Amino acid sequence: MPMYGDLGNKLVQHAKRTQNLTHLPPYQTELVRAVTREVRDLDKDVASLLEPFQGSFDPSTDQATACTLLVNHLSMRRNKRCLLAYHRTRTDKLEELVWNGSDVLDLAGQQAGGVNGAAADSGAGSSLSPQEEDYFRQYGDLLSAYKGQWTDIDLTGSLEPPRDLFIDVRVLKDAGEIQTEYGAINLTKNSQFYVRQGDVERLIAQGYLQKLG
């Protein structure tokens, strides 16, 4: 028999798995709605239990009701914490993806092209909820405005200095033509290049290129 908090615990498990992934899994729309609905139902139960007392409830005179109220209150509080933890984890992952230079359309394509089972659970064609897509775009705009103050510095670049100035890379998916210090390169799938690492770090982070060796 399901107990209060079981659905919230599932959200926490999803959040824990998300922390170990390089992408963002589908948003659990139905599960979030179910947890929210449980909180509202518990709140209605609390109001119904307290209604006969008209604001004069004394826990010491009705310990059974007091116990029920305590369980309901703690269950609501736990569910809210689970909801906050789930959404905070996804928000942190979204911000990480923005700093890595990922595109919101790439995120939307992860589900359509990959995890069909998870797509059925979320009932949407994107890994993100509409609110997350909006947050992603707005956060990206803020980051662009922030970076614009220091045009000579790539604030989203790696904090570790490269060990090799030039590296061999393989193109995993078409990325079109890019401009480097030594000229233009047309990145077509399965082709290989010997390039300056600083010119392609972002493309490696985005999954377009694979560093060889």
From Swiss-Prot:
This protein's UniProt keywords: DNA replication, Nucleus
GO BP: any one term: mitotic DNA replication initiation
Highest rank taxon of the organism: Eukaryota
Pfam families in the cross-refs: PSF1_C (PF24997), Sld5 (PF05916)
Protein's UniProt keywords contain Glycoprotein: no
Compartment list: Nucleus
One GO cellular component term: nuclear replication fork
Annotated InterPro entries: GINS_A, GINS_bundle-like_dom_sf, GINS_Psf1, PSF1_C
Claim: Nucleus is one of the keywords in the record: yes
UniProt function note: The GINS complex plays an essential role in the initiation of DNA replication.
Family membership noted in the UniProt record: Belongs to the GINS1/PSF1 family.
Subunit field text: Component of the GINS complex which is a heterotetramer of SLD5, PSF1, PSF2 and PSF3.
Protein name: DNA replication complex GINS protein PSF1
Organism per entry: Chaetomium globosum (strain ATCC 6205 / CBS 148.51 / DSM 1962 / NBRC 6347 / NRRL 1970) (Soil fungus)
Protein encoded by which gene: PSF1
